[in-house]
């Protein structure tokens, strides 16, 4: 099947596919309509010339290359293309003498398909060789990174730096060229991100090596920390380069991303559970421990982490973990309630506490087993990939030694492990059957090579057979691992809500459990938010979570019994929809409040750590102060990460923002212990310049990452809501200050005033970012003026707070401070108002009564109605032709996933009127065309010509959507929305081009009996996946274009009318 993951492959395949589509249509006209096929000598000669040139270049490359895999894989591709060309030439010659020849028509269609498939194979083989060149450079850097472990002198360090630089430059250049060539936007982003991380870590590596060499040679303290810093940086760089190598080899969507994320999440959850277990059990053992203190919070965090693991599991494993979490949560509530009533030492309370303690052990064991199983399957999958890669090199070399056989045997052993962990017996048996076949073929090939016949035609054919069988085995094991995981919900809130809504609307449709997974994900996030809330707020949110959970379970039960369309189910669906809306609103309010509190000050703890690390050697309690500040910094960093994750999950962020937050949280978690180690080196080596520079490097890297995280979190939540939450928090801080002054508590006053100042500065940062993001001069001016006013109020308030703290009983000073506080509040309100400009009054106010003029003149008489005439009725508004989505007829054969993707786009576009909005009109047209394609692709109706023409019409509508979206982006004043719109719409042309090529491939197979079911199904699968991607990209483009149209330039000549068919308030 054709792959086109690079622009070069796509640019060569498109014109070939265009020529082939003409030949396919001619074939059909001859076969179905009985028409004479015209002389094809000229078009066939054009195809032959293009392909022959490609083959000639390929053969020249094979002669000069040292790449054994290229030498092995090129000849079969040459033969395939040349045979197909021969068939086309023969067909053209036969049709010259007999335009109605049936064998000639067969040659024509088979040759056409062979040309497309063979050209694709040829281009892919070329491309794989180019990728191997880049990988060789990457592996060279990987090997040289390990040399860092033996660098122990400054001379060695200088030499190491000089040698590493050119290699890094070469790798960066090759990666940059490669990412520009890729058509998959996600793969481009992954390569760029990993390469940028490697570049950022290079100075950190040199700094870490330098401090290690310095401490080792001077025999100073801190060598262990220096070693940790160096090894961490080497490990991190190696991991990123390995990720680059993995992404370079991807030719389609990324199947492995979830596995590494899930394994990492499980390990992190386990580590967190282990660290909290003693504290939790201590609270349970002590009947006098207060409810709500750190011990109870530890239990809540354990249940939260275990719940995350449960959500990553499937089937029985998932039910057991989540059921245990829920039960232990309820029992902990009961223990806390009994202790709050002073009954903590009662037999009932003691028994409950002991049951919770035992339950935590059981839960931990279940979580460990789940993590172990996922890690085993993931490790086996990754091991198979490496061993098969090595085996392919051995298979390409006729004189290869016995080590290749060992690699194959190792791959088969790992595949057997996956088979044994499979829940599906059919999948397990399929893998085991493949293992037996590959073992037999490999043994036969090994015998031939040991006899010195490795270069014989039989051995070469066997080697090719084993190579293909290994690739098929890898596909089967990958699928088995993927199927062992639960259905994946969207990563962002709107995506989850949409998936949930789709299931609620049609609970009987099989969506592979995605809708219910989305609801479970939302409920799980609700529980996580509730865990940090206190008292009635927590209970209220938990009650809403439970309500959604119960309604979803009841609806799923009805659907399972075949009653998903019953009146009871419809009533349940309506209740569930309302409950989800309530839950979403409360979750977003809770999350915004938490962001306002936790992100009000991100850098003070690291600055205090820096002060402690640079304290003079004779400072009192130097070590104790440092340890305390290091612990505070670590806790603070953890809180930032946890809150950012909640903002990603519950905020209004898009997928790229969510992934950006997750990446920055991961980096913060990794950097935090390294910063503490660097600070400890500085503490133990006062005055050491290398230690100071190294700490500064690590500190700045942490601060830069947290600033990036803060910006992304601000993107994820509504700015107006954040300002509202911050304003409310300042009011509460001001109330605390009043209490402090009344109770003569200067420290409490200082804490409140400091919090007010931090929150005000945070508001200034948010406002500054929004000004930088906007190109609307009026908005920028209004926000900047309000920000400047707020900025002027902060310092006077801090000065007044210091004055009143020094003499807290002075009423005059108290009044001055409160006046300063209220001025800050007033300035904050003005900033908030600048983000919500006043709407003009509607309807307009009546004119002043003074303007009315009364006269004595009578009004003229009313003219008589026309006699004998009946006014014509008002004509009905013209109906929009693209409103109705075609329903599937009884017995009609369609491709269900393709039809579903088309329906989802149509549902999105139907929210808006297409009058005066060409994007909506084109999107509806595309959805209807894709619905038609879902019929054609199964060959149930229509023709090859219809399939090819349908793909062309979809591509034409795609071009229209892209052109219009770019026009909207050009006029949008919001840089962030503009970038999002361009990123989404720029995917569309590539996908629509691929759709045309894949449709041509599929058309060559319709009605043919000499094609295997597997080959035909593979072509359909690729076409379906492409169609789903296209529909999703257009759907996202519609949403982003609507958002961008709100922020359009006032002087823009280009406008689109966005009129909702169903108003938002209904």
UniProtKB/Swiss-Prot annotation:
Q: What InterPro entries does this protein's entry cite? A: Alpha-catenin/vinculin-like_sf, Vinculin, Vinculin/catenin, Vinculin_CS
Which of UniProt's keywords are assigned here?
Acetylation, Actin-binding, Cell adhesion, Cell junction, Cell membrane, Cell projection, Cytoplasm, Cytoskeleton, Lipoprotein, Membrane, Palmitate, Phosphoprotein, Repeat
- Which segments carry the region annotation Linker (Pro-rich)? 836-878
Q: What is its main location?
A: membrane
> Residues where N6-acetyllysine occurs?
173, 496
Spell out the residue ranges making up region: Facilitates phospholipid membrane insertion.
935-978, 1052-1066
What's a single GO MF annotation on this record? Answer: dystroglycan binding
Q: Where is this region: Interaction with ACTN4?
A: 741-764
Segments of this protein annotated with the region C-terminal tail: 879-1066
Modification type Phosphoserine: residues: 97, 260, 272, 275, 290, 346, 434, 574, 579, 600, 721, 795, 809
Q: Where is this region: N-terminal globular head?
A: 1-835
How this chain sits in the membrane, per its record, is: Peripheral membrane protein
Q: Which Pfam families match?
A: Vinculin
What is known about its processing and modification? Phosphorylated; on serines, threonines and tyrosines. Phosphorylation on Tyr-1065 in activated platelets affects head-tail interactions and cell spreading but has no effect on actin binding nor on localization to focal adhesion plaques. Acetylated; mainly by myristic acid but also by a small amount of palmitic acid.
**Stretch list, region Talin-interaction:** 168-208
Residue ranges, annotated region (Disordered): 857-887
* Chain positions with Phosphotyrosine modification: 537, 822, 1065
Q: Where is this region: 3 X 112 AA tandem repeats?
A: 259-589
Residues carrying Phosphothreonine: 604, 672
Q: Where is the composition biased (Pro residues)?
A: 860-876
Pinpoint the residue ranges of every sequence repeat in the record. 259-369, 370-479, 480-589
Q: Where in the cell is it found?
A: Cell membrane; Cell junction, Adherens junction; Cell junction, Focal adhesion; Cytoplasm, Cytoskeleton
Subunit architecture: Exhibits self-association properties. Part of a complex composed of THSD1, PTK2/FAK1, TLN1 and VCL. Interacts with APBB1IP, NRAP and TLN1. Interacts with CTNNB1 and this interaction is necessary for its localization to the cell-cell junctions and for its function in regulating cell surface expression of E-cadherin. Interacts with SORBS1. Interacts with SYNM. Interacts with CTNNA1. Binds to ACTN4; this interaction triggers conformational changes. Interacts with FLII.
What's the stated role of this polypeptide? Actin filament (F-actin)-binding protein involved in cell-matrix adhesion and cell-cell adhesion. Regulates cell-surface E-cadherin expression and potentiates mechanosensing by the E-cadherin complex. May also play important roles in cell morphology and locomotion.
Q: What is this protein's name?
A: Vinculin
Provide the species name: Rattus norvegicus
């Amino acid at each position: 099947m054709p792959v086109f993951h690079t622009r070069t492959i796509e640019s060569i395949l498109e014109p070939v596919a265009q020529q082939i589509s003409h030949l396919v249509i001619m074939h059909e006209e001859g076969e179905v309509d009985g028409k004479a096929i015209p002389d094809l000598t000229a078009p066939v000669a054009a195809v032959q010339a293009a392909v022959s040139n490609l083959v000639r270049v390929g053969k020249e490359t094979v002669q000069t290359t040292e790449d054994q895999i290229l030498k092995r894989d090129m000849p079969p591709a040459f033969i395939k293309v040349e045979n197909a060309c021969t068939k086309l030439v023969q067909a053209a010659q036969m049709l010259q003498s007999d335009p109605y020849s049936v064998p000639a028509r067969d040659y024509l269609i088979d040759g056409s398909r062979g040309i497309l498939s063979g050209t694709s194979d040829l281009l892919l083989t070329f491309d794989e060789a180019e990728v191997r060149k880049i990988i060789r450079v990457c592996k060279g850097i990987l090997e040289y990174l390990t040399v860092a472990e033996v660098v122990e002198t400054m001379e060695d360090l200088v030499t190491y730096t000089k040698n590493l630089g050119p290699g890094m430059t070469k790798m960066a250049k090759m990666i940059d060229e490669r990412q520009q060539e890729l058509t998959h936007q996600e793969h481009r982003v992954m390569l760029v991100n990993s390469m940028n991380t490697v570049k950022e870590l290079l100075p950190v590596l040199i700094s870490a090596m330098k401090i290690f060499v310095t401490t080792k040679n001077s025999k100073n303290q801190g060598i262990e920390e220096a070693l940790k810093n160096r090894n961490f940086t080497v490990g991190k760089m190696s991991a990123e380069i390995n990720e680059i190598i993995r992404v370079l080899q991807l030719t389609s969507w990324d199947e492995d991303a979830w596995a590494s994320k899930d394994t990492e999440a499980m390990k992190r959850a386990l580590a967190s559970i282990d660290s909290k277990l003693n504290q939790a059990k201590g609270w349970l053992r002590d009947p006098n421990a207060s409810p709500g203190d750190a011990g109870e919070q530890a239990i809540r965090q354990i249940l939260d982490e275990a719940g995350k693991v449960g959500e990553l599991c499937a089937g029985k494993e998932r039910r057991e973990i989540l059921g245990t979490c829920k039960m232990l949560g309820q029992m902990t509530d009961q223990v806390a309630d009994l202790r709050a009533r002073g009954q903590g030492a009662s037999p009932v309370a003691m028994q409950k506490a002991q049951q919770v303690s035992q339950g935590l052990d059981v839960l931990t064991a279940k979580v460990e087993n789940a993590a172990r199983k996922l890690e085993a399957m993931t490790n086996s999958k990754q091991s198979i990939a490496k061993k098969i890669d090595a085996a392919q090199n051995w298979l390409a070399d006729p004189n290869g030694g016995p080590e290749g056989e060992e690699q194959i045997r190792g791959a088969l052993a790992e595949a057997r492990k996956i088979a044994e962990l499979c829940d599906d017996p059919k999948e397990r048996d399929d893998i085991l059957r493949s293992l037996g076949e590959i073992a037999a073929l490999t043994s036969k090939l090994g015998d031939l090579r040991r006899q010195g016949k490795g270069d014989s035609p039989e051995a070469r054919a066997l080697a090719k057979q084993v190579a293909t069988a290994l690739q098929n085995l890898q596909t089967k094991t990958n699928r088995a691992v993927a199927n062992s995981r639960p259905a994946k919900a969207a990563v962002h809130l709107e995506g989850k809500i949409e998936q949930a809504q789709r299931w609620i609307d049609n609970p009987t449709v099989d969506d592979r459990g995605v809708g219910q997974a989305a609801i479970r994900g939302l409920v799980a996030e609700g529980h996580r938010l509730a865990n940090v809330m206190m008292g009635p707020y927590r209970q209220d949110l938990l009650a809403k979570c439970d309500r959604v959970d119960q309604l979803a379970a009841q609806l799923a039960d009805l659907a399972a019994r075949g009653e998903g369309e019953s009146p009871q189910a419809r009533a349940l669906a309506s209740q569930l929809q309302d409950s989800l809306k309530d839950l979403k609103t409360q979750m977003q309010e809770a999350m915004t409040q938490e962001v306002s509190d936790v992100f009000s000050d991100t850098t003070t703890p690291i600055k205090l750590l820096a002060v402690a690390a640079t304290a003079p050697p004779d400072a009192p309690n130097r070590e104790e102060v440092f340890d305390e500040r290091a612990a505070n910094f670590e806790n603070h960093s953890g809180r930032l990460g946890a809150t950012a994750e909640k903002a990603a999950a519950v905020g209004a962020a898009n997928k790229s923002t969510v992934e950006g937050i997750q990446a920055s949280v991961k980096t913060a978690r990794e950097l935090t212990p390294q910063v503490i180690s660097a600070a400890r080196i500085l503490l133990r080596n006062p005055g050491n310049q290398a230690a100071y520079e190294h700490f500064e490097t690590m500190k700045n890297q942490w601060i830069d990452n947290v600033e990036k995280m803060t910006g992304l979190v601000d993107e994820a939540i509504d700015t107006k809501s954040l300002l509202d939450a911050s304003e409310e928090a300042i009011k509460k801080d001001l109330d605390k200050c009043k209490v402090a002054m009344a109770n003569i508590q200067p420290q409490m006053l200082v804490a409140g005033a400091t919090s007010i100042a931090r929150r005000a500065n945070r508001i200034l940062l948010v406002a500054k970012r929004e000004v930088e993001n906007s190109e609307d001069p009026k908005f920028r001016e209004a926000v900047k003026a309000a920000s400047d006013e707020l900025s002027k109020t902060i310092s006077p308030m801090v000065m007044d707070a210091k004055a009143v703290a020094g003499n807290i009983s002075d009423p005059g000073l108290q009044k001055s401070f409160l006046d300063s506080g209220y001025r800050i509040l007033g300035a904050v309100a003005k900033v908030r108002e600048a983000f919500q400009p006043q709407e003009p009054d509607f309807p307009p106010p009546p004119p002043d009564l003074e303007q009315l003029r009364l006269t004595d003149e009578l009004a003229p008489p009313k003219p008589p109605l026309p006699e004998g005439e009946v006014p014509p009725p008002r004509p009905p508004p013209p109906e929009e032709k693209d409103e109705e989505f075609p329903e599937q007829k009884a017995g009609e054969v369609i491709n269900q996933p393709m039809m579903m993707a088309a329906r989802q786009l149509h549902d999105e576009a139907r929210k808006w009127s297409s009058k005066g909005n060409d994007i909506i009109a084109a999107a509806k047209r595309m959805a209807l065309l894709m619905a038609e394609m879902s019929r054609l692709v199964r060959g149930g109706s229509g023709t090859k010509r219809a399939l090819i023409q349908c793909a062309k019409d979809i591509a034409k509508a795609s071009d229209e959507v892209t052109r219009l979206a770019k026009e909207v982006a050009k006029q949008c004043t919001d840089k962030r929305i503009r970038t999002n719109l361009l990123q989404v719409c720029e995917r569309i042309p590539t996908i629509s081009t691929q759709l045309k090529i894949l449709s041509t491939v599929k058309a060559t197979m319709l009605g043919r009996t000499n094609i295997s079911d597997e080959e035909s199904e593979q072509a359909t699968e690729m076409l379906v996946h492409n169609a789903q991607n296209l529909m999703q990209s257009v759907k996202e483009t519609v949403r982003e274009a609507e958002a961008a149209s709100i922020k359009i330039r006032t002087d823009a000549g280009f406008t689109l009318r966005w009129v909702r068919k169903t108003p938002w308030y209904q």
